[in-house]
């Protein structure tokens, strides 16, 4: 009994569609997807736009300390209705004015310096947010790439295992015809081939699904079949928590709280400005040519009492500082714990992979011996199938362990 021709035709088409030679021009590596993800991310574009917009605020602050020139104009004509109308002592009979005023804040070096410092710190915070967003995006893309690559490894293994079973089919058929093996042994092989065909198809479906997920994450509109190259993720050996982006954020937050306190102090600092104006200010239109003039002077403002709002603002900043310290201390403890966890998992996974390789090597030698002995009719064919099943389990464990190792390396590399 043989497999139906339609099944083998379908198998041939499937294997051809997955042929590495056919897809040699469609190989892609991790860098391709990382670059595409960074270029297409609307979140990164938005963060970069916010950073550029905040840089413009420094120019706005600088302009605010330069002379401010304004112009005002007013024409007021109160009609005389006999016994009714506004009192002329109040309205002066009308108002006709047009004045240009220039005002300059004096002794503004300190306020300007503090505001520039605050904007600089905000720029640093935004730049750090961009860096953290890039790290998160790269980590997510790499994790999905590893998942898809693991699926591809599973496809390759299932194809190779299918070839092993198919290679035994002609020899076993001849041995069955010669009475060395039973017809049930041949049927058992065919069932194993059918099972492996289904496993291969499921692996292909899973690979394509995870490849689509990778394209979605990177903003790539592409339906073509590609071969993913093995990701090269270096083993990060140096970890300095003080240089981590998250710890830098805590430091910037501390400096911003200090700058906020200085801004509060500036609000209560006396302010002095000089002004000058020129124009026309008349109550009678006929006197406008004679009412052209100018004036100048000083403006002084100082807060005397505001209900102790300054102290309340100080208390609010103090609460924010305490909260910042709590988050920083928790992050520091969490960082070290996470680092130890990942390093322990990596060591354990490396040991597991080494053990699985030894097991697979032994199973491969046994499988080769079975092939020779089957050809001579020296072993039960069911024992060969059991060995193939055991070999399959070990290879699946190896694929999963290697996937876990790559994921751990990804976690370590982008630990923040």
Regions found by a protein language model. Give the residues of each.
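Small/polar (Gly/Ser/Thr/Ala-rich) solvent-exposed segments
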Residues: 45, 68-89, 103-132, 268-294, ...
């Amino acid at each position: 009994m043989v497999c139906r021709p339609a099944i083998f035709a379908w198998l041939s088409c499937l294997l051809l569609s997955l042929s590495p030679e056919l897809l040699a021009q469609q190989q892609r590596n991790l860098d391709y997807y990382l670059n595409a993800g960074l270029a297409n991310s609307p979140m990164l574009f938005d963060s970069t736009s916010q950073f550029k917009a905040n840089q413009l605020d420094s120019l706005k602050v600088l302009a605010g300390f330069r002379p401010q020139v304004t112009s005002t104009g007013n024409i007021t004509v109160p009609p005389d209705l006999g016994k009714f109308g506004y009192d002329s002592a109040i309205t002066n009979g009308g108002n006709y004015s047009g004045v240009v005023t220039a005002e300059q804040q004096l002794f503004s070096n300190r306020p300007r310096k503090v505001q520039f410092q605050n904007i600089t710190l905000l720029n640093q915070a935004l730049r750090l947010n961009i860096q953290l967003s890039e790290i998160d995006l790269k980590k997510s893309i790499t994790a999905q790439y590893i998942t898809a690559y693991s699926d591809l490894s599973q496809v390759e293994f299932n194809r190779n295992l299918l070839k092993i079973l198919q290679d035994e089919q002609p020899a076993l058929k001849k041995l069955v015809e010669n009475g060395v093996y039973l017809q049930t042994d041949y049927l058992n092989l065919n069932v194993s081939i059918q099972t492996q065909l289904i496993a291969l198809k499921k692996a292909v479906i899973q690979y394509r699904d995870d490849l689509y997920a990778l394209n979605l994450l990177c903003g790539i509109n592409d339906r073509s079949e590609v071969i993913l190259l093995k990701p090269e993720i270096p083993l990060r050996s140096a970890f300095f928590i003080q240089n981590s982006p998250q710890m830098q954020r805590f430091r910037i937050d501390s400096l911003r709280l200090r700058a906020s306190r200085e801004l509060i102090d500036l609000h209560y600092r006396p302010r002095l400005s000089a002004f000058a104006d020129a124009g026309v200010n008349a109550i009678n239109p006929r006197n406008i040519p004679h009412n052209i003039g100018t004036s100048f002077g000083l403006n002084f403002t100082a807060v005397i009492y505001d209900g102790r709002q300054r102290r309340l603002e100080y208390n609010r900043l103090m609460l924010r500082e305490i909260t910042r310290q709590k988050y920083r201390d928790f992050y520091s403890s969490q960082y070290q714990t996470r680092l130890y966890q990942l390093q322990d998992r990596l060591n354990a996974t490396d040991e597991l992979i080494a053990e699985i390789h030894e097991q697979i090597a032994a199973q491969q030698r046994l499988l080769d011996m079975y092939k020779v002995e089957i050809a001579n009719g020296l072993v039960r064919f069911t024992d060969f199938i059991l060995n193939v099943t055991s070999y399959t389990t070990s290879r699946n464990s190896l694929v999963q362990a290697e996937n876990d190792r790559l994921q751990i390396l990804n976690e370590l590399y982008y630990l923040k």
